[in-house]
């Protein structure tokens, strides 16, 4: 669903069942995964990738890649939590949601750099499609992923 006055530049890829709310501006070559929601008045920098099942708050400036299954907000854009309500609506099990939550705790809340976090996730979590999707997204991020929330 693409709402009123949204601007979608050249060569963008928007996944199925995604929602682009009013007055969103997408730069060129932006990729948005399935079931993503981009809040109104948000601006997405060129070449940014937004993962599946994400929710980006309105008025956000998205300069970095946003991994799958998360909620993102604040300025600068940062991790707010996982999109648990959206995942439940799409029939993710409690076990899958718990696994995703635990993976993002390692990635964003344990003071590891991305390489250290990915190594720990690969060791500590059994292979699953959601784990592998998160790992692949972070490893293949061209612009780097958004940061974790810092209260400072």
Question: Model features per residue range: what roles?
Answer:
Residues 69, 75-152:
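Terminal amphipathic alpha-helical/low-complexity segments used for targeting or macromolecular assembly
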Residues 1-74, 78:
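Structural signal for interior beta-strand "rungs" in well-ordered beta-sheet cores
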């Amino acid at each position: 669903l693409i709402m009123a006055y949204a601007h979608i530049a050249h060569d963008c890829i928007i996944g199925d069942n995604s929602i682009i709310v009013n007055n969103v501006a997408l730069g060129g070559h932006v990729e948005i995964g399935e079931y993503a929601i981009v809040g109104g008045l948000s601006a997405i920098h060129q070449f940014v990738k937004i993962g599946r099942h994400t929710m980006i708050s309105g008025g956000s400036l998205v300069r970095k890649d946003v991994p799958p299954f998360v909620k993102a907000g604040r300025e600068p854009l940062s991790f707010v939590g996982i999109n648990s309500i959206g995942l439940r609506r799409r029939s993710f099990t409690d076990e899958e949601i718990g696994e995703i939550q635990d993976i993002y705790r390692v990635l964003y809340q344990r003071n590891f750099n991305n390489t250290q976090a990915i190594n720990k996730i690969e060791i500590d979590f059994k292979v699953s499609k959601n784990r592998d999707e998160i790992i692949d997204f972070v490893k293949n991020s061209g612009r780097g992923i958004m940061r974790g929330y810092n209260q400072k």
